[in-house]
Amino acid sequence: MRFDVIIVVSLLCLGCMMQPKPEASLYQRIGGLPMLTRISNQTLDIVSKDPKTSRSFDGVKMKTLKESLTNFLCVKTGGDCVYEGETMQKSHADLHITTAEFEWMVDVLRERLDVNGVGTREKNELLKILAPMKRDVVTN
């Protein structure tokens, strides 16, 4: 009887030691703050200069916008940043962003994720998180 108890306790302890490690957050898997900063900066550099979308960036302090977007993505992917910006709806209300403009920015973001080596799984997870925001950003 005592031997049986020792075996059971040993197996339970072994099972506790073999618990799978929790999966890394999307933030970690993407590459953390350095990668999110790079992707945010590159995306905004492209869309702010492209004739299809540049009008939305007239008079915008790009350094502040880049920091804000980086913090926003950090929070949305599970990082420990703090986003202090407005809601998506409030910050885009007066910009009259069209569906075509929104989709162009998503295309640029997708391309920047690819160029920077972000995996397909992580890219799709991020886009799935951001997709519902279309209704808050597009007003035309």
Could you say what each language-model-derived stretch is?
Residues 1-6:
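Bacterial N-terminal signal peptides that target proteins for export
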Residues 13-15:
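C-terminal motif of bacterial Sec signal peptides marking the signal peptidase cleavage site
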Residues 17-140:
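Core of compact, soluble alpha-helical bundle domains
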